[in-house]
Regions:
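Core subunits and conserved enzymes of cellular information-processing
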Residues: 2-224
Length: 224
Protein backbone atom coordinates (compact mmCIF):
# COMPACT_ATOMS: atom_id res chain seq x y z
CA UNK A 1 0.00 0.00 0.00
CA UNK A 2 1.27 3.43 -0.97
CA UNK A 3 0.44 4.87 2.45
CA UNK A 4 3.14 2.65 4.01
CA UNK A 5 5.74 3.14 1.25
CA UNK A 6 6.58 6.84 1.60
CA UNK A 7 10.25 7.33 0.73
CA UNK A 8 10.72 10.97 1.71
CA UNK A 9 9.21 13.59 3.97
CA UNK A 10 6.84 15.55 1.68
CA UNK A 11 7.31 19.30 1.27
CA UNK A 12 3.92 21.03 1.10
CA UNK A 13 2.76 24.62 0.74
CA UNK A 14 3.14 25.44 4.45
CA UNK A 15 6.50 23.68 4.91
CA UNK A 16 9.64 25.69 5.61
CA UNK A 17 11.87 25.79 2.53
CA UNK A 18 14.90 24.81 4.61
CA UNK A 19 15.34 23.14 8.00
CA UNK A 20 17.96 25.68 9.10
CA UNK A 21 15.64 28.63 8.58
CA UNK A 22 15.87 31.49 11.07
CA UNK A 23 12.70 33.15 9.71
CA UNK A 24 10.33 30.26 9.03
CA UNK A 25 6.72 30.80 7.95
CA UNK A 26 4.41 31.21 10.97
CA UNK A 27 2.18 28.43 9.65
CA UNK A 28 5.15 26.04 9.67
CA UNK A 29 5.90 26.94 13.30
CA UNK A 30 2.22 26.43 14.19
CA UNK A 31 2.14 22.92 12.75
CA UNK A 32 5.55 22.13 14.23
CA UNK A 33 4.18 22.88 17.69
CA UNK A 34 0.93 20.99 17.06
CA UNK A 35 2.86 17.93 15.86
CA UNK A 36 5.27 17.97 18.78
CA UNK A 37 2.41 18.40 21.25
CA UNK A 38 0.67 15.33 19.81
CA UNK A 39 4.01 13.49 19.92
CA UNK A 40 4.25 14.31 23.63
CA UNK A 41 0.66 13.24 24.28
CA UNK A 42 1.38 9.90 22.61
CA UNK A 43 4.51 9.37 24.70
CA UNK A 44 2.46 10.17 27.80
CA UNK A 45 -0.16 7.58 26.84
CA UNK A 46 2.57 4.98 26.40
CA UNK A 47 3.91 5.80 29.86
CA UNK A 48 0.40 5.69 31.33
CA UNK A 49 -0.27 2.27 29.80
CA UNK A 50 2.37 0.83 32.13
CA UNK A 51 3.22 -2.23 30.03
CA UNK A 52 6.59 -1.23 28.65
CA UNK A 53 8.70 1.81 27.92
CA UNK A 54 9.81 3.06 24.49
CA UNK A 55 12.65 1.23 22.70
CA UNK A 56 15.13 4.04 23.32
CA UNK A 57 14.36 4.03 27.04
CA UNK A 58 15.08 0.28 27.02
CA UNK A 59 18.45 1.07 25.42
CA UNK A 60 19.14 3.76 28.03
CA UNK A 61 18.23 1.27 30.77
CA UNK A 62 20.66 -1.23 29.29
CA UNK A 63 23.45 1.34 29.14
CA UNK A 64 22.67 2.31 32.74
CA UNK A 65 22.85 -1.31 33.92
CA UNK A 66 26.08 -1.98 32.03
CA UNK A 67 27.97 1.19 32.96
CA UNK A 68 26.48 1.98 36.35
CA UNK A 69 25.52 5.54 35.37
CA UNK A 70 22.07 6.92 36.17
CA UNK A 71 19.19 6.52 33.73
CA UNK A 72 19.13 10.26 33.07
CA UNK A 73 22.82 10.34 32.18
CA UNK A 74 22.43 7.22 30.06
CA UNK A 75 19.54 8.81 28.16
CA UNK A 76 21.67 11.90 27.54
CA UNK A 77 24.62 9.93 26.16
CA UNK A 78 22.38 7.77 23.99
CA UNK A 79 20.98 11.00 22.49
CA UNK A 80 24.52 12.31 21.94
CA UNK A 81 25.43 9.06 20.17
CA UNK A 82 22.38 9.34 17.91
CA UNK A 83 23.18 12.96 17.06
CA UNK A 84 26.78 12.00 16.22
CA UNK A 85 25.40 9.68 13.54
CA UNK A 86 23.87 12.73 11.87
CA UNK A 87 27.33 13.84 10.74
CA UNK A 88 28.02 11.04 8.22
CA UNK A 89 24.33 11.10 7.24
CA UNK A 90 24.56 14.87 6.53
CA UNK A 91 21.41 15.51 8.52
CA UNK A 92 20.63 19.19 9.19
CA UNK A 93 19.32 20.40 12.57
CA UNK A 94 16.86 23.25 12.94
CA UNK A 95 14.63 24.93 15.47
CA UNK A 96 12.51 21.79 15.38
CA UNK A 97 15.45 19.81 16.76
CA UNK A 98 15.59 21.87 19.95
CA UNK A 99 11.81 22.28 20.10
CA UNK A 100 11.51 18.49 19.95
CA UNK A 101 13.25 18.12 23.30
CA UNK A 102 11.57 21.06 25.05
CA UNK A 103 7.96 20.69 23.88
CA UNK A 104 7.73 16.92 24.23
CA UNK A 105 9.20 16.98 27.74
CA UNK A 106 6.89 19.83 28.79
CA UNK A 107 3.86 18.08 27.30
CA UNK A 108 4.59 14.87 29.19
CA UNK A 109 4.88 16.77 32.47
CA UNK A 110 1.60 18.62 31.82
CA UNK A 111 -0.52 15.80 30.38
CA UNK A 112 0.54 12.80 32.51
CA UNK A 113 -1.67 13.72 35.51
CA UNK A 114 -4.71 13.76 33.20
CA UNK A 115 -4.15 10.29 31.71
CA UNK A 116 -6.65 7.94 33.40
CA UNK A 117 -5.31 4.66 34.74
CA UNK A 118 -6.45 1.93 32.31
CA UNK A 119 -8.59 -0.86 33.74
CA UNK A 120 -7.17 -4.30 33.12
CA UNK A 121 -4.68 -5.57 30.59
CA UNK A 122 -6.95 -4.89 27.61
CA UNK A 123 -7.18 -1.24 28.63
CA UNK A 124 -3.41 -1.02 29.03
CA UNK A 125 -2.83 -2.59 25.63
CA UNK A 126 -5.36 -0.28 23.97
CA UNK A 127 -3.72 2.78 25.55
CA UNK A 128 -0.29 1.64 24.31
CA UNK A 129 -1.65 1.23 20.78
CA UNK A 130 -3.35 4.64 20.88
CA UNK A 131 -0.15 6.18 22.23
CA UNK A 132 1.90 4.70 19.39
CA UNK A 133 -0.58 5.97 16.79
CA UNK A 134 -0.61 9.44 18.37
CA UNK A 135 3.19 9.63 18.33
CA UNK A 136 3.09 8.63 14.67
CA UNK A 137 0.50 11.28 13.82
CA UNK A 138 2.45 13.98 15.63
CA UNK A 139 5.70 12.89 13.99
CA UNK A 140 4.27 13.12 10.50
CA UNK A 141 2.86 16.60 11.08
CA UNK A 142 6.00 18.12 12.62
CA UNK A 143 8.33 16.50 10.08
CA UNK A 144 6.34 17.98 7.17
CA UNK A 145 6.91 21.42 8.73
CA UNK A 146 10.55 20.86 7.67
CA UNK A 147 12.09 22.80 10.56
CA UNK A 148 14.46 20.07 11.68
CA UNK A 149 13.80 16.62 13.14
CA UNK A 150 14.46 15.30 16.63
CA UNK A 151 17.39 12.93 17.20
CA UNK A 152 15.58 9.67 16.37
CA UNK A 153 13.59 11.10 13.47
CA UNK A 154 16.76 12.64 12.05
CA UNK A 155 18.43 9.23 12.16
CA UNK A 156 15.38 7.80 10.40
CA UNK A 157 15.29 10.36 7.58
CA UNK A 158 19.07 10.25 7.17
CA UNK A 159 19.15 6.46 6.84
CA UNK A 160 16.19 6.59 4.48
CA UNK A 161 18.08 8.90 2.13
CA UNK A 162 21.11 6.61 2.20
CA UNK A 163 19.23 3.34 1.69
CA UNK A 164 16.30 4.45 -0.44
CA UNK A 165 13.99 2.20 1.57
CA UNK A 166 10.50 3.23 2.74
CA UNK A 167 10.42 5.29 5.92
CA UNK A 168 8.21 2.72 7.66
CA UNK A 169 10.80 -0.02 7.12
CA UNK A 170 13.72 2.16 8.17
CA UNK A 171 11.98 3.32 11.36
CA UNK A 172 10.99 -0.23 12.30
CA UNK A 173 14.59 -1.38 11.80
CA UNK A 174 15.89 1.45 14.00
CA UNK A 175 13.41 0.80 16.81
CA UNK A 176 13.97 -2.97 16.79
CA UNK A 177 17.73 -2.42 16.84
CA UNK A 178 17.35 -0.20 19.91
CA UNK A 179 15.15 -2.80 21.64
CA UNK A 180 17.52 -5.69 20.93
CA UNK A 181 20.64 -3.77 21.98
CA UNK A 182 18.92 -2.51 25.12
CA UNK A 183 17.66 -5.97 26.05
CA UNK A 184 21.09 -7.53 25.53
CA UNK A 185 22.56 -4.86 27.81
CA UNK A 186 20.02 -5.57 30.54
CA UNK A 187 17.09 -3.28 29.71
CA UNK A 188 13.48 -4.33 30.37
CA UNK A 189 11.22 -5.04 27.40
CA UNK A 190 7.43 -5.01 27.79
CA UNK A 191 4.45 -5.55 25.52
CA UNK A 192 4.12 -1.80 25.05
CA UNK A 193 7.74 -1.70 23.88
CA UNK A 194 7.04 -4.28 21.19
CA UNK A 195 3.84 -2.51 20.12
CA UNK A 196 5.75 0.74 19.69
CA UNK A 197 8.72 -0.87 17.91
CA UNK A 198 6.54 -2.52 15.26
CA UNK A 199 3.84 0.14 15.07
CA UNK A 200 5.66 3.47 14.97
CA UNK A 201 7.15 3.04 11.47
CA UNK A 202 3.81 2.42 9.71
CA UNK A 203 2.15 5.11 11.87
CA UNK A 204 4.71 7.76 10.87
CA UNK A 205 4.48 6.77 7.20
CA UNK A 206 0.68 6.94 7.24
CA UNK A 207 0.77 10.33 8.94
CA UNK A 208 3.22 11.73 6.37
CA UNK A 209 0.99 10.48 3.58
CA UNK A 210 -2.25 11.83 5.05
CA UNK A 211 -0.70 15.16 6.08
CA UNK A 212 0.55 15.69 2.54
CA UNK A 213 -2.77 14.72 0.95
CA UNK A 214 -4.77 16.92 3.34
CA UNK A 215 -2.43 19.80 2.43
CA UNK A 216 -3.22 19.39 -1.27
CA UNK A 217 0.14 17.80 -2.11
CA UNK A 218 0.14 15.12 -4.80
CA UNK A 219 2.34 12.18 -3.87
CA UNK A 220 4.22 10.73 -6.76
CA UNK A 221 7.95 10.21 -6.37
CA UNK A 222 7.69 9.79 -2.60
CA UNK A 223 6.16 6.35 -2.90
CA UNK A 224 6.27 3.48 -5.31
Amino acid sequence: MRIFKIKAVPIVGWSSKDAFNMRPPPIAIFWLFIGLFLFGVGETMLIGAGIGVSPWTVLAQGVSVTTGMGIGAATFWVSVAILSLWIPLRQKPGIGTLSNVVIIAATIEFVLPFIPAPEGYVGQFALAVMGTLTVGIGSGIYLVANLGPGPRDGLMTGLQRCTGQPISWVRTFIELSAVICGWLLGGTVGVGTVVFAFGIGPAVSASLYLTARCSGHRLGSEAD
